[in-house]
Curated annotation (Swiss-Prot):
Entry protein name: Probable jasmonic acid carboxyl methyltransferase 2
GO biological process: methylation; oxylipin biosynthetic process
Catalytic activity of the protein: jasmonate + S-adenosyl-L-methionine = methyl (-)-jasmonate + S-adenosyl-L-homocysteine
Protein's UniProt keywords contain Acyltransferase: no
InterPro entries with a match to the protein in the record: MeTrfase_7, MeTrfase_capping, SAM-dependent_MTases_sf
List of residues binding Mg(2+): 174, 260, 262-263
Location(s), subcellular: Cytoplasm; Nucleus
Function: Catalyzes the methylation of jasmonate into methyljasmonate, a plant volatile that acts as an important cellular regulator mediating diverse developmental processes and defense responses.
Molecular function terms from GO: metal ion binding; methyl jasmonate methylesterase activity; S-adenosylmethionine-dependent methyltransferase activity
Gene3D superfamilies cross-referenced by the UniProt entry: Methyltransferase, alpha-helical capping domain (1.10.1200.270), Vaccinia Virus protein VP39 (3.40.50.150)
Keywords tagged on the record: Cytoplasm, Magnesium, Metal-binding, Methyltransferase, Nucleus, Transferase
Any Pfam family: Methyltransf_7
Amino acid sequence: MEVMQVLHMNKGNGETSYAKNSTVQSKIISVGKPIIEEAVHEISCNNLLESMGIADLGCSSGPNTLSVISEIMDMVQTTSRRLGRPVPEFRVYLNDLYSNDFNYIFMSLPAFYHRLKEEKGIGCGSCYISGVAGSFYGRLFPSKSLHFVHSSSSLHWLSQVPPGLESKALAPLNKGKVYISKSSPQSVLNAYSLQFQNDFSMFIESRSQELVPGGRMVLSFMGRRSTDPTTEESCHHWELLAQAIMSLVREGLIEEAKVDSFNAPYYAPCAEEIKVEIQKVGSFVIDRLEGFEIDWDGGAVSDVQTAQGKLLIGQRVAKTIRAVVESMLESHFGIGQDIMDDLFSRYAEIVGNHLSKTRTKYINLVISLIKKG
């Protein structure tokens, strides 16, 4: 699987689009807001800036993209005025892979600029927004051009499927699964862990060259509390998706060999794995590292014991996951819209049944870093 070509959130603003099904990601941004605010406040207090470089990495599309930028600008503006300083110009860079729906973002900019002027008094001559296409697992910006880097719900995606998972032996390494599970052999766990180490180190090293000394970075992504990568909090949503896919295999709608050869380019690390890679690179000080529980549906459904509640929460989770992974499934399995609809209908039922018994939650890790001088 060529991750850079096939990984993108569902485009547009239709019923299965990311724009309409990103409540969980919005909740994650909201939970991390105090940490973002603290970091932005420190930058504004410690630097008299005429121009401020801000990058949102893995920006995707939809309402979350510009809302987080608006909030960061609010924070800078509030602190600057409190200190009696002029508000700096904003150089905003929105980054994602080449296949991201940048057009959706660009079409939203006129209304965004209008709101900036009406609500905040910030004219177009004070805010410059650009799209930057490419992988953040490598350099994206000139040296020392950024003051603040934000990334949310992106760094759990790997740059590639871990090498070696496509076994040449007769028996597949991770048979019947699409990600790490309780039945996965140690070699699968090791391959995923090593890929994360390589990717995250590359990310940190690249940003260390692009941020000014004293620059800040707040990263938020899926993780886990346990050192065991097979716990429910880190991989059970993939396990349930595999169950839905295998039900289609049993009916002859999907080839089993296709399932055995699919491995999600995803990894939910524990805090210790993150610390090790940051210390290895040596360019940043860890200011904060915290974990938060997030409901699979973003907390929208409170009563899952009733038949209606079970149905509703299953559908909400299925829509959220579909908006994120459909492009990969479509590319790998080559299935049409009818089978895709059937798959996520089954997934919704499986998820609803699971959450009516156990309210498994995501663990979202938020880390605030300071670039060393």
